[in-house]
From Swiss-Prot:
It comes from Microcebus simmonsi (Simmons's mouse lemur). GO terms for cellular component: mitochondrial inner membrane; respiratory chain complex I. GO terms for biological process: ATP synthesis coupled electron transport. The gene is MT-ND4L. This is NADH-ubiquinone oxidoreductase chain 4L. Belongs to the complex I subunit 4L family. Its main location: mitochondrion.
Length: 98
């Protein structure tokens, strides 16, 4: 396994660990989720370029589109929660209340 793949897998694991450790703040969770998506994008792009499989060149673009949609929805949710409650602590929110 080349060293670049090890570094990207380490970046994914670090972002996943950050997601598990800092899950009380919504902004930290969103940043860790973006880090995971970025490392998945880079790893899938490198894998496809190394395999030279021309039919799957659209897979990294599709992953990038999903990451952009996830970021937009996450930021909209963060703005909504911040406007309604004044903070982004997930543990203090009861989203089931009207």
């Amino acid at each position: 396994m080349p060293s670049i793949s090890i570094n990207i897998n380490l970046a994914f694991a670090t972002a996943l660990l950050g997601m598990l450790m800092f899950r009380s703040h919504m902004m930290s969770s969103l940043l860790c989720l973006e880090g995971m998506m970025l490392s998945m994008f880079i790893l899938s792009t490198l894998t496809i370029l190394n395999m030279q499989f021309t039919m799957s060149f659209t897979m990294p673009i599709l992953l990038l589109v999903f990451a952009a949609c996830e970021a937009a929805i996450g930021l909209a949710l963060l703005v909504m929660v911040s406007n309604n409650y004044g903070l982004d602590y997930i543990q203090n929110l009861n989203l089931l209340q009207c």
